Amino acid sequence: MNIPQDLKYTKTHEWVKIDGNKAKVGITDFAQYEITDVVHVELPEIGKQVKKAQPAAVVESVKSAFDIYSPLSGKILEVNDSVLRSPEVINQSPYENGYLFIIEFTDEKEIADLLEADSYKNLI
């Protein structure tokens, strides 16, 4: 399993890349492996306010649909349209081309609740 050291993680298998007051969000390599072949993605609307630990997106496989939870509270700044057109990119490149959305977070203290790579590795 690929678990990049420079990212933060959630217990629900989302990854977060912090950049100033913005955070890029996707699902982990472990999550995409468990979900198997991603066939459809529903992303939040740009400008939508999201709350930490609340559903923000949906990833569907041939087996089932999985809620993707926002790791931080804030406003959706950008969504990755390429995963809407080609959802399989989430399986192929979960940490790069397969990211889901970028959020402008509103509570920096919530970052402390995210897991470091080693803690996430122990979780899975």
From Swiss-Prot:
The record, for Pfam families, names: GCV_H
- InterPro entries given for it? 2-oxoA_DH_lipoyl-BS, Biotin_lipoyl, GCV_H, GCV_H/Fam206, GCV_H_sub, Single_hybrid_motif
**GO terms under biological process:** glycine decarboxylation via glycine cleavage system
UniProt keyword Transmembrane helix, yes or no: no
Q: N6-lipoyllysine (modified residue): where?
A: K63
Q: How is the cofactor bound?
A: Binds 1 lipoyl cofactor covalently.
The UniProt family comment states:
Belongs to the GcvH family.
Q: Show the HAMAP family listed in the entry.
A: GcvH
Job of this protein: The glycine cleavage system catalyzes the degradation of glycine. The H protein shuttles the methylamine group of glycine from the P protein to the T protein.
Tell me what this protein is called.
Answer: Glycine cleavage system H protein
Q: Which organism is it from?
A: Endomicrobium trichonymphae
